[in-house]
Swiss-Prot record:
Pathway: Cofactor biosynthesis; ubiquinone biosynthesis. One of its GO terms (molecular function) is 3-demethylubiquinol 3-O-methyltransferase activity. It is an enzyme of class 2 (transferase). SUPFAM superfamilies: S-adenosyl-L-methionine-dependent methyltransferases (SSF53335). InterPro entries: SAM-dependent_MTases_sf (IPR029063), UbiG_MeTrfase (IPR010233). It comes from Cereibacter sphaeroides (strain KD131 / KCTC 12085). It catalyses: a 3-demethylubiquinol + S-adenosyl-L-methionine = a ubiquinol + S-adenosyl-L-homocysteine + H(+); a 3-(all-trans-polyprenyl)benzene-1,2-diol + S-adenosyl-L-methionine = a 2-methoxy-6-(all-trans-polyprenyl)phenol + S-adenosyl-L-homocysteine + H(+). Belongs to the methyltransferase superfamily. UbiG/COQ3 family. Pfam families: Methyltransf_23. Keywords: Methyltransferase, S-adenosyl-L-methionine, Transferase, Ubiquinone biosynthesis. Its EC number is 2.1.1.222, 2.1.1.64. Gene3D superfamilies: Vaccinia Virus protein VP39. This is Ubiquinone biosynthesis O-methyltransferase.
């Protein structure tokens, strides 16, 4: 894999150590499995709106080239492929790729998984209609350089979906103390709270990278129903944004 200034080796090592767990809904990635329907709801609605696609069609995203950066085991890549997109999944952790490839093959899906980085793909001239950048930006060494590479990966008119975690006392209490220390949904140290990014900070970085932010929503966990939902107002912990490359 090509080296990149935004890759944080310590962050990559954390996820490499958990590679075999990706498709276990009760394992170390249980929070992502629980959040996935909410993430997919936002992603599909934003893509459909931006590219004028009918989600009731058999393959609504047919003809769209989509990159899933930090794809892990393919929790988002596979649903996007089922909707008809040409999917490339990229991950900096080498052990994630064979896990993702095997599961896609077992599911009868043609997904191009690669052990590479956003910067390497951009340098190679790869371009996409959609870039998924989900729960990655809080793990990179240089968020602005990383988002700039994401911008280079988009065709003019292309769409980037980016999700991350807010940085405030509530997010520390829920994402660090609650999820890692008390509930043990994730191994301790999975997240570094100091790397969390506020919504306004992310919007500023996105603009500096040359993209136009067009939407953002909170992703809110309900401990009673044990489910996630989108919120236009509550961006206090998890949130997701949509941005467009205009030129």
């Amino acid at each position: 894999m090509e080296s990149s200034s935004t890759i944080d080796p310590a962050e990559v090592a954390k996820f490499e150590a958990m590679a075999a767990e990706w498709w276990n809904p009760h394992g170390k990635f249980k929070p992502l499995h629980q959040m996935n329907p909410c993430r997919l709801d936002y992603i599909t609605q934003q893509i459909a709106a931006e590219f004028d696609r009918d989600l009731s069609a058999p393959l609504p995203f047919e003809g769209l080239r989509l990159l899933d950066i930090g794809c892990g085991g393919g929790l988002l890549s596979e649903p996007m492929a089922r909707l008809g997109a040409e999917v490339i999944g990229a991950d900096a952790a080498p052990r994630n790729i064979p896990v993702a490839k095997l599961h896609a093959e077992q599911s009868g899906l043609a997904i191009d998984y690669r052990n590479t980085t956003a910067e390497a793909l951009a340098a190679a001239g790869e371009r996409f209609d959609v870039v998924l950048n989900m729960e990655v930006v809080e793990h990179v060494a240089d968020p602005l350089a990383y988002l700039t590479a994401c911008r280079e990966l988009l065709k003019p008119g292309g769409l980037m979906i980016c999700s991350t975690l807010n940085r405030n006392p509530k997010s520390f209490a829920m994402a660090i103390v609650g999820a890692e220390w008390v509930m043990r949904w994730l191994p301790k140290g999975t997240h570094d709270w100091s790397k969390f990014i506020t919504p306004d900070e992310l919007y500023d970085l996105i603009r500096k990278a040359g993209l136009d932010p067009v939407d953002r929503k909170g992703m809110v966990f309900n401990p009673v129903s044990w489910s996630w939902s989108l919120s236009a107002r509550d961006l206090s912990v998890n949130y997701v944004t949509a941005s467009v490359r205009r030129t």
